[in-house]
Curated annotation (Swiss-Prot):
Name used for this protein in its record: Probable xylan O-acetyltransferase 9
GO biological process terms, semicolon-separated: xylan acetylation
Lineage, uppermost ranks: Eukaryota, Viridiplantae, Streptophyta, Embryophyta, Tracheophyta
Top-level EC class as recorded in UniProt: transferase
EC number: 2.3.1.-
Length: 454
C-alpha cells in the first residue's frame, strides 16, 4: 500500500491554534515568576539547606532592611547535608531532614523591645577595641536589629539551656580577631546564666594566644585560640603581628592543632589575613625568618593558598575529632566597609565612619569581599571535604549590609591619632571589627541554632 503523502508546510501551519502560542507564553511567564518556588516544591534544588523544627513566625513589626537571598552570596549558604546523627541536637535525632528554612536568608528587623541581648556595661570581658559606647559612640541604634530568616524564626537564645547542654564540654573558637570578637560575644551572652562573678572566671595567657571563660557550675569552658591562618605562619604572635610579607607553612596544621585536641565544639574562622594581594607566599621548607637560600618558598594564588589551609583544617578534623560526639563549624568571611563608593556613598574616600544606617540593597556585595574565596570553600567542601560534617555559618551576606555596626573610631586607639587624623576621623576609622553588643551576637544566635536545631 502506498503511504499517504506528507502534509504540506501550509497545512501544518494551519493546524497550529493561536491558543497554543498563548499557552506557551503563559507557561514561560509562570516559569519566570515562580520557577524558584516550583524547584523548592519539587525538591530539585542542587544545594541542600538546613531544616529547623521550631515554629515559623511572622517577620514582626518595625523597619525591615533588606531581604537577603541565597543567590546573592555566590557560595555555600549552609551546612552540607550530613546523614549521620549530629551531636548536641535538640530536635529529634539530629539528622538533616527535608528542607524547611535557610536561616542565613532573610532580613534585618528593628526590635526596640528585645535588643540588645545584653548591655555593654554588664559584660566585663569586652575588650577596649570593641567597647564602642565606652569610647564615645553617641548612638546605639546599631544594637537594635534582629535577624529574621525568611519563613521561620530563630529560637530564642537561652544561656542556661546552652550551658546545661554543654555541661562538662569545651567550646573553642580558633582564628583571628574576628573570631575573638565572636568568642567574646558568646561569653557575654552566656553571662545571663552565670551572673555571679564568683561562679565564673576568665583568663588570658601571658602571650595572649589563648583565652578561657569557665562556668564552674557547669564545668564548661568557652575558649579562644589565636591562629589567624589556622596554619603556622609568621604572624602567630598574638600581640605583635603587623607583618606585611605574610606567609604560611604548608602541612603545618598540627603546629596549632595540638592545642585544639579535646574540644567538643570548634568554631574556625580565617579570611582577612589572606587578603594581601592576588598571590600568597607558601613556606615549603626552612625557617620563616631565614635570609638567602636557607628557606624554600613558592607563590600561589590567594584562593589556592586559602583552599590548601581549608583542606588541612578538614584533615585535622578527620584525624582528631569523633564526629559522633563533636561538632565542627566554620564562620564565613567577615566583610569590611572601607570604600563608601561601594554602596553609593557621597563623600570621596569615605568609609564606615559616621554611618548609622545599614545598606538597603539586597544584592549588595562589597569590593573587599572576595567571591573567589567563597567559591574555594564550596569546592573543597563538595570535593575533598565531603566526608566531614562541617557546619558552614554563612554570615557574610547578612553582615555585608551592616556598615553601621563597625567600631569605627569608637575604640581604644593603641597609637594616639595625629592632629591630621583627628581633623579627618575617617582616616583612622576601623571598618573591620564590630561593636559589642552588636552584629556578632547574631552570628552566635545562628551558631546556637545550628548547634541545637540543625
Amino acid at each position: 500500500m502506498k503511504a499517504p503523502p506528507p502534509p504540506s508546510p501550509v497545512a501544518k501551519r494551519a493546524r497550529v491554534s493561536p491558543f497554543v502560542f498563548l499557552l506557551v507564553l503563559f507557561l514561560l511567564l509562570f516559569s519566570f515568576l515562580y520557577g524558584e518556588d516550583l524547584k523548592e516544591l519539587l525538591g530539585s534544588q542542587a544545594q541542600a539547606r538546613p531544616s529547623l523544627h521550631f515554629n515559623a513566625a511572622a517577620a514582626g513589626d518595625g523597619i525591615e532592611l533588606p531581604a537577603a537571598t541565597a543567590a546573592t552570596t555566590e557560595g555555600r549558604t549552609t551546612t552540607r547535608r550530613w546523614r549521620g546523627r549530629l551531636p548536641f541536637a535538640a530536635n529529634g535525632d539530629g539528622e538533616e531532614e527535608e528542607e524547611e528554612c535557610d536561616v542565613f536568608s532573610g532580613r534585618w528587623v528593628r526590635d526596640e523591645a528585645a535588643r540588645p541581648l545584653y548591655r555593654e556595661a554588664d559584660c566585663p570581658y569586652i575588650p577596649a577595641q570593641l567597647a564602642c559606647e565606652a569610647h564615645g559612640r553617641p548612638e546605639t541604634a546599631y544594637q537594635r536589629w534582629r535577624w529574621q530568616p525568611r519563613g521561620c524564626a530563630l529560637p530564642a537564645f537561652d544561656a542556661a539551656a546552652m550551658l546545661d547542654r554543654l555541661r562538662g564540654k569545651r567550646v573553642m573558637f580558633v582564628g583571628d580577631s574576628l573570631g575573638r570578637g565572636q568568642f567574646t560575644s558568646l561569653v557575654c551572652l552566656l553571662l545571663a546564666a552565670v551572673p555571679d562573678p564568683a561562679a565564673r572566671s576568665f583568663a588570658t595567657s601571658p602571650d595572649q594566644q589563648r583565652s578561657v571563660f569557665t562556668a564552674a557550675a557547669y564545668n564548661a569552658t568557652v575558649e579562644f585560640y589565636w591562629a589567624p591562618f589556622l596554619l603556622q605562619s609568621n604572624a602567630d604572635n598574638a600581640a605583635v603581628h603587623r607583618i606585611s610579607d605574610r606567609m604560611v607553612r604548608r602541612g603545618s596544621i598540627g603546629h596549632h592543632g595540638r592545642h585544639w585536641e579535646g574540644a567538643d565544639v570548634i568554631v574556625f574562622n580565617t579570611y582577612l589575613w589572606w587578603c594581601t594581594g592576588l598571590q600568597f607566599r607558601i613556606l615549603e621548607d626552612g625557617p620563616f625568618d631565614a635570609g638567602g637560600n636557607s628557606s624554600t618558598t613558592t607563590w600561589v594564588s590567594t584562593e589556592e593558598a586559602y583552599a590548601m589551609a581549608f583542606r588541612e583544617m578538614l584533615q585535622w578534623a578527620r584525624e582528631h575529632m569523633d564526629f559522633a560526639t563533636t561538632r565542627v563549624f566554620f564562620t564565613s568571611m567577615s566583610p569590611t566597609h572601607g570604600k563608601s563608593q561601594d554602596w553609593g556613598g557621597g563623600e570621596p574616600g569615605g568609609n564606615c565612619y559616621g554611618e548609622t544606617e545599614m545598606i538597603g540593597d539586597a544584592a549588595y556585595w562589597g569590593s573587599d569581599s572576595r567571591r573567589g574565596v567563597m567559591r574555594a570553600i564550596g569546592e573543597v567542601l563538595d570535593g575533598d571535604g565531603a566526608d566531614v560534617p562541617v557546619t558552614f555559618l554563612n554570615v557574610t551576606q547578612l553582615s555585608l549590609y551592616r556598615k553601621d555596626a563597625h567600631t569605627s573610631v569608637y575604640k581604644k586607639q593603641w597609637t594616639p591619632p595625629t592632629p591630621e587624623q583627628l581633623a579627618d576621623p575617617k582616616t583612622y576609622a576601623d571598618c573591620v571589627h564590630w561593636c559589642l553588643p552588636g552584629l556578632q551576637d547574631t552570628w552566635n544566635e545562628l551558631l546556637y541554632t545550628k548547634l541545637f536545631y540543625p
